[in-house]
């Protein structure tokens, strides 16, 4: 944390030539359903070799069986990001993916509402995706994570960061 932001870095490892350091952090509390919301941005990468993520990951660590909800996953190739909902069919990874054409280096408020009936993705308080496939919606407890990734086969010239200004998690309360 620096200057009031969570900074997940990507940089060259100063102690090991040819290696990179990437950052990540995970919330300790797990939730089954809820709303996950955060204000986030990712540095533009001139070499198109990195990615930043805001996601939920299963408490069980059983992937893909217990799902993965990539709420914000920046693309390596361009200045966009995706939401990916991973789930398993016969133990094999399947996913729904939606691409968003917003500048990833600008600040955005991104949210996911996750209920037994749907997953909804919001960008800057606007609903942009509504997924209602019950097979794809995990019932397993998940926790919020932020992380960075680096394609080691592509060039790298400067440190990059995924920044999070704030994050909120709202507990799911079933309707009566």
Write out the residue ranges for each language-model feature:
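GH16 jelly-roll
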Residues: 1-176
